[in-house]
Amino acid sequence: MERVWNPAAGIDGLKRSETYLVDPHDFVGVLTLSPYTVFERGLFVRMSGMRLLALLAAPKPQEPQPAVRRFPQRSRRNVCLKACADGAQSLAKVLAARVSMPPCMSKTMADLSSAPRGNMYRKRFEFNCYLANVITCTKCKTACLIGALLHFYRMDAKCVGEVTHLLIKAQDVYKPSNCAKMKKVTKLCPQASMCKGLNPICNF
């Protein structure tokens, strides 16, 4: 079965004989599409590992320049999640042990662990934004966080698209909703007045 390619992983682990689903937005100016191009799941193009390697080796166009990932200048918890990306360790268990998450994020993570899809978009968005703001890895440069989330979401195509957009393609780091909105609007705050600050990212 074909796998959704994670652009943050680069050529590491890429196998020529396997088939991958690739987001054409990752190869703007390199991959040529036509009216006859077949899109899998409405988002991806199927290609062999050999062709994907060739695309990665192809000269990149000078314009437009790819978006530069800009992280906010604030302290974050240095946690390597490579073992979670490989499936050797549970992301939920590692985060519970290494990060002091607020109740809203702990509950959201538990809910997503059971079922990442099914009216769960808001929870995925808030959880992804929270981790993007509080977790870093000086060794992997956030690639392990992306891989861990993809494994956590069971490589679901929609979830993969959301993660890659938020953590790779977006120019700015989105913040999760503030605590007031979490409580009154999205109803994701299970225990008010138990955290410091006005946003979940104040707690890690």
Swiss-Prot record:
A Pfam family annotated for this UniProt entry: Baculo_LEF-2
InterPro entries given in the database record: Lef-2 (IPR004283)
GO-annotated biological processes: viral genome replication; viral transcription
Keywords: Transcription, Transcription regulation
Keyword Transcription tagged: yes
Protein family membership: Belongs to the baculoviridae LEF-2 family.
Function: Required for late and very late gene expression. Specifically required for expression from the vp39 and polh promoters.
Record protein name field: Late expression factor 2
